Curated annotation (Swiss-Prot):
This is Replication initiation control protein YabA. Keywords: Cytoplasm, DNA replication, DNA replication inhibitor, Metal-binding, Zinc. Belongs to the YabA family. GO terms for biological process: DNA replication. GO terms for cellular component: nucleoid. It comes from Staphylococcus aureus (strain Newman). Binds 1 zinc ion per subunit. It is found in: Cytoplasm, Nucleoid. NCBIfam families: PRK13169.1-2 (NF009641).
């Protein structure tokens, strides 16, 4: 193998690495977008459940009703964390908590919101 062949292989490898890096960045952006949308929809769903839970008439047939399962109420702290994240602060566990994100998305913060 001469120098030109080696150089061409290195150039092709560099182009492949650049393409993979670009695709990885696109996938990361898509994942962040999907997680943010999921968190927003979960919060909206929880709020709608609260509203519907308060407005629904309480007509329960006790003879045919099954024991109710324990309903997990959303914590208001999660709403507060979502607000902080929306204002640009880290909410993930560790030393980044409370520091400004400078407009960048953090997958760890989004994971905290999705739990």
């Amino acid at each position: 193998m001469d120098r030109n062949e080696i150089f061409e292989k290195i150039m092709r490898l560099e182009m492949n690495v650049n393409q993979l890096s670009k695709e990885t960045s696109e996938l990361k952006a898509l994942a962040v977008e999907l997680v943010e949308e999921n968190v927003a929809l979960q919060l909206e769903n929880d709020n709608l459940k609260k509203v519907l839970g308060n407005d629904e008439p309480t007509t329960i047939d006790t003879a045919n009703s099954k024991p109710a399962k324990a309903v997990k109420k959303p914590l208001p702290s999660k709403d507060n964390l979502a607000i902080l994240y929306g204002e640009g602060f880290h909410i993930c566990k560790g030393e980044l908590f409370g520091k400004h994100r400078h407009g960048e998305d953090c997958l760890f913060c989004l994971e905290v919101l999705s739990d």
